[in-house]
Amino acid sequence: MQKWEAPRARPSIAYNDPVTSDFITRLPKAELHLHLEGSVDPLTLSQLSEKHHTPFPWANNRYQPLPNSHRPLTVAEAAALYDYTDFTGFLMAFKAVTERLRDPEDFELIAYRLVEKLAAQGCLHAEVFVSVGVIFWRGQEFDPLFEGLERGRIRGEKDFGVSLYWIFDAVRHFGPEEAEKVVATAIRLQASSVIGIGIGGDERLAAPELFAQVYAQAARAGLRLSVHAGETVGAPSIYGALDVLGAERLGHALHAGDDAALLSRLVHQQVPLELCLTSNLRTGCCAELALHPLRRYFDAGALVILNTDDPEMFQTTLVREYQLAQDVFGFTNEELRQLAANSFRASWLPQERKRKLLNLL
């Protein structure tokens, strides 16, 4: 059988925004909160849909396919999936992507295209979440898919000079047993490219205490620890991430400012805060962009980093996030340079590589 090859897609990095400054595009930077599946653009989703136009062969009855998943999506239909107005719409878009990621070549394709897009934005390093918990939940065999990921990463690094680490992501509301599978797999495949674990999903449905043993196991194995916390609920979730799970970085942390003592601690300990402006706006976690705590956290001395979260699904780019910081929050070029420096400092790169990247600023 002839190997399927998708038509070449160019990076889609403009979303009807004002022209961004050359300074921002050229500014060396890293991205530390980015979901692989959320980087799939409508053209690629349409191509995957054409390739896989039969219902997914579910290995269990826990996960139901979307309506019309038996036919290919046009590019326009794929783009329309990303034009949602609430969190449910986002989940449907995410599901539409994961349904069509079925074989190693699919993962190789999206990993390679992600590296290409990052390079176009002056991003020199990224630490990328892979939804391993979802893959297991669907009954897929992970190892062959990981081999595809690695091929895409290695080709991308060679062609574009952008380094990538993988963070294996579990899902809170799937429970601790499913999370343990994710951690065990990260430990088994731990190498230079598998750097850590994360956990996302609904903070309201599963307390941090449920995952304490899982995170302790990961820490003993030398994996780095990230936690989505304070995105949809308040400060207690962040305290749990820090004190129960031992989080080294916090995803979103929107509600850290609700508790003055907590914010002071985050500043004092320089815990990296992975902020995602457009994501928080589009999911409704932040009512309007001007209310986002980016400026407050930065001025308080917190170690904040700008990120895209799910760039294609939120119709943003890392360049656009930096431009928003300047246009909406008044960040100067020098302050943007500080944000870029934060992204390198908060990364899990070796110290020598960090120094080399920081010297570029």
Language-model regions, residue ranges each:
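Metal-cofactor-binding active-site regions of metalloenzymes
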Residues: 15-223, 232-237, 244, 248-249, ...
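Cationic, low-complexity basic patches in intrinsically disordered or flexible, solvent-exposed regions
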Residues: 3-4, 65
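Acidic, Ala/Val/Gly-enriched low-complexity intrinsically disordered segments
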Residues: 5-9, 14
